[in-house]
């Protein structure tokens, strides 16, 4: 199973808003604490019991870090490095709402236990800007 966390924008309150996809299908919105966010890259995932939340969570195997897992929250201050996942997002406020971490764990549970889940974390491509740059380069080099 493949997850992809696409980071869309940084917020005035110190967060990074994004979108989470599971096997190419939109799952929910994400929010990370910009100061403690996971580096971009490809990571394996596993099931981990969280004493803090008294439940199993979908955890991310980040080298040099422990207890990085998807959980609920609304603001960047609700995370010390973990991605928060939710149903809705308020881009102006830099917040999310409607915890989906339990739903995510249940969806991934069997694959997490079998070691068959990976996540790619990256910045989303800004297509309008990218196309403008490519267009300018083509114009410049074909004159």
Which residues does each predicted region cover?
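Single-pass alpha-helical membrane anchors
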Residues: 126-143
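Cell wall/extracellular polymer interaction/catalysis modules
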Residues: 1-117, 123
């Amino acid at each position: 199973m493949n997850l992809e966390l696409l980071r869309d924008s940084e917020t005035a309150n110190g967060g990074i808003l994004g979108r989470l996809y599971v096997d190419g299908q939109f799952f929910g919105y994400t929010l990370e604490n910009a100061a403690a966010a996971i580096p971009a890259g490809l990571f394996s995932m596993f099931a981990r019991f969280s004493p803090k939340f008294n439940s199993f969570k979908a955890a991310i195997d980040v080298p040099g870090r422990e207890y990085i897992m998807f959980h609920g929250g609304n603001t960047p201050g609700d995370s010390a490095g973990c991605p928060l996942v939710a149903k809705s997002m308020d881009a102006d406020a830099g917040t999310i709402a409607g915890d989906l971490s339990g739903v995510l764990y249940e969806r991934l549970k069997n694959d997490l236990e079998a070691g068959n889940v990976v996540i790619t974390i990256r910045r989303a491509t800004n297509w309008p800007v990218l196309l403008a740059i490519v267009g300018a380069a083509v114009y410049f080099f074909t004159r």
